[in-house]
Amino acid sequence: MFIDTAKIFVKSGKGGDGSISFRREKYIAFGGPDGGDGGKGGNVVLVVDPNMTTLLDFTYKRKYKAEPGGNGAGSKCFGKNGKDLHIKVPMGTIVKDVETDKIMADLSKPEDSYVVAKGGRGGKGNCRFTTPTRQAPDFAEPGMPEEERWIKLELKLLADVGLIGFPNVGKSTLLSVVSKARPKIANYHFTTLKPNLGVVSIEGVNNFVIADIPGIIEGASEGVGLGLDFLRHVERTRVLIHVIDISSVEGRDPYDDFLKINEELKRYSVKLYDRPQIIAANKSDMLFDEEKFEEFKTKVEKHGYNKVFKISAATKQGVDDLMKEAARLLSTIPVTDLEISEEDRFIEEEKRFTYSIRKEDNTYIVEGSFVDRLLNAVNVNDPDDLRYFHKVLKNKGVMEELMEMGIEDGDIVRLNDFEFDFLL
């Protein structure tokens, strides 16, 4: 079974809360604040495992959660950091955010990793808020919240050469001849239901990986048949070998097949269509009219395809020359990473200090994660806490934005359930 897409839920660890604590020692009646910071929450990290070849594991487990950070304690004890959760994925995995459908990462190298959900920062303990005028703060920061999201994993094969062509033209047979791969081979459409990989090793040329891409049919670029699920596997290949049944024993027209497959490639991706393509006229051992090959070759050469090889995968005729040409072409084409446009790239939102302000009559409502975090940290009924509260609003630009919106003396500012009268 080949699983090439998976959807999983990931959740990082929440940051530990800062501690509100004061020294309690014999003979020290009024000890100062000594609340420690909370620990950082664990990250969820995707890590490439070169030994993995499918996303099958994610059909059995779909939810992953990292450890939260420990809370701070007295005596300036810091909370323990939560452990990162490492999730292994195969090379060639594309990571997408489900909500936005944007690409987060392309994990195509053995050493690649990506933090898909960042752990929350630990909150500061009350000892961090001591100033010359505030020597006994009785508030501390809560830990930053965890990140959670659904992500989609897409596996795109890391093959150098892709075999394309209609079903039943001999791609699987060719793969079995040039490598040690043993794909399922039979005489019916869609024999290959998953891409098969093999390593081509020919004396005098560098080894390369070749993939037998499942049969493409007319309409594949629109999802017909095996469609888009398998076209995506061709995207990473640097050279395409287009296998054609030149024998016409099934009543197919080789030239018509050639045009239809290339039309599907062009509709799916112009870049894919422009990739170097070698034509392999297969089943030549069953061709009884040599003029048919010459006629076919002349027609495809008019489209700019000058590398046309007459082969027979069954008898191995012409196969070595075909593979050597593929190796030669590969040596001229550098390996490139997947290009991610700005439109498709996922941009992480800044979640630490986010807020918005809206006006209802003479009331200005401030809301957002910043507001929740601030109100959780302070006691608005305590004068020292309230002074700190107003200082934070000023430092973070809330007061300035309120004045730009035209707030006047006596107007009400509301943050969740807390309200105060604005004074210039």
Swiss-Prot record:
Residue ranges of domain OBG-type G in the record: 159-331
Binding, GTP: 165-172, 190-194, 212-215, 282-285, 312-314
SUPFAM superfamilies: Obg GTP-binding protein C-terminal domain (SSF102741), Obg GTP-binding protein N-terminal domain (SSF82051), P-loop containing nucleoside triphosphate hydrolases (SSF52540)
EC number(s) on file: 3.6.5.-
Gene Ontology CC: one annotated term: cytoplasm
Protein location: Cytoplasm
GO terms of molecular function: GTP binding; GTPase activity; magnesium ion binding
Keyword field: Cytoplasm, GTP-binding, Hydrolase, Magnesium, Metal-binding, Nucleotide-binding
Keyword GTP-binding: yes
Residue ranges occupied by any OCT domain in the UniProt entry: 345-424
Residues bound to Mg(2+): S172, T192
Biological process, per Gene Ontology: ribosome biogenesis
Cofactor: Mg(2+)
Superkingdom of the source species: Bacteria
Ranges for domain Obg: 1-158
UniProt cross-references to NCBIfam families, sorted A to Z: Obg_CgtA, Obg_CgtA_exten, PRK12296.1, PRK12297.1, PRK12299.1, small_GTP
Family indicated by similarity: Belongs to the TRAFAC class OBG-HflX-like GTPase superfamily. OBG GTPase family.
Role noted for this protein: An essential GTPase which binds GTP, GDP and possibly (p)ppGpp with moderate affinity, with high nucleotide exchange rates and a fairly low GTP hydrolysis rate. Plays a role in control of the cell cycle, stress response, ribosome biogenesis and in those bacteria that undergo differentiation, in morphogenesis control.
Subunit structure: Monomer.
The protein's name: GTPase Obg
Native species: Clostridium botulinum (strain Okra / Type B1)
Source species taxonomy: Bacteria, Bacillati, Bacillota, Clostridia, Eubacteriales
